[in-house]
């Protein structure tokens, strides 16, 4: 990211280099790279826009389909009344298809009944019927049925979000330090129940004479809340990634790369919210806004 930015920094008696944010001069190559990142982000949103159902498995027999008599009702055009059910017992989680309903696994093999094994990530294998697919996921120790529809009207209806103008005030030279051991922390989630996530290190930067820090997750993942949250930006905060150094050291912290989490455009997601220590007490006028593109 740094190679796209020319840094001019003039030291004064009261300001150090890391705070003179407006001395970042943005080249055309920087703008091009940022816009390309946003295009890729828009393409990746399709998998969330396909989501059409999220249901907690809290019964022994959990039937699903279009009919109102199902435990879980799917509002999908031309869907069969009932696809099948996910049955819970003390020893097993099993999907049973309705007779004469074609259901396949990831290998394209037709199945009538199958045990659903939960993997290390808390997910079962995916199953398919026409344009829909589903799997069981785990959140906060609870099992949920998640359903996708590749023809979901939401895919075409969603036009994207507007962003703030590219703002060099919110590009910082920050210091990143790895924690001695990975920290596991409980955070709030879209489901309304706490969930756990891990943090591997911390960013430190200065803005208008004040020191700030942000805890960073695996892969450089950062959840951020600020005083625009719930006003011009999504109330549950925004996400971004940083390029992690191999060892403790300087990194570029560019808030122009902030983006809305999936919960901002799909009700069937399970986003995590920023922890308390990642709530910034200033208005971060950079990155994606909540207003949708017309």
Where are these regions (language model features)?
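Sec-dependent signal peptide recognition
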Residues: 2-8
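C-terminal motif of bacterial Sec signal peptides marking the signal peptidase cleavage site
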Residues: 15-16
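N-terminal beta-hairpin/loop module of FHA
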Residues: 33-77, 224-228
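Forkhead-associated
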Residues: 56-122
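Surface-exposed beta-loop interaction hotspot
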Residues: 128-195
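Extended, aromatic/histidine-rich regions of cofactor-dependent oxidoreductases associated
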Residues: 159-160, 250-252, 256-294
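Flexible, glycine-rich surface segments
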Residues: 173-229, 234
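C-terminal soluble interaction/assembly domains
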Residues: 232-246, 250-252, 256, 262
